[in-house]
């Protein structure tokens, strides 16, 4: 029931804000770099590196870092996806929301317990919903939340 309600909510939001949304385009996923970065191919733009907007997953050297990448691969490896461009980051990567049909992949990574909501950068209205999904994953102890004290990747990177 919850999945159905969420799907309908996202369709409603997408329809309501479509004219206001960022540029969206179709592409084929050619590789998954890690849990929050992919490479896609689009005939107009060629190969493009995409950083998933609003989330941060464990780094490869952290517990659940490789698992986050594998989970993302299981969702979209080789798939045709829609990329909704939000911005470009300081590394020149496109930052966007990735959709596989009606599934918001960024949101799904949080729901499945493989990503934190990146509070520093997630400033869209739907980010509050993602925070609820993160809290649910934490309380259900799924994904990275199986660890007793998971270290957020931004803290882990700062320590390195």
Predicted regions and their residues:
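Small beta-barrel nucleic-acid-binding modules, primarily SNase/OB-fold domains
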Residues: 2-16, 20-160
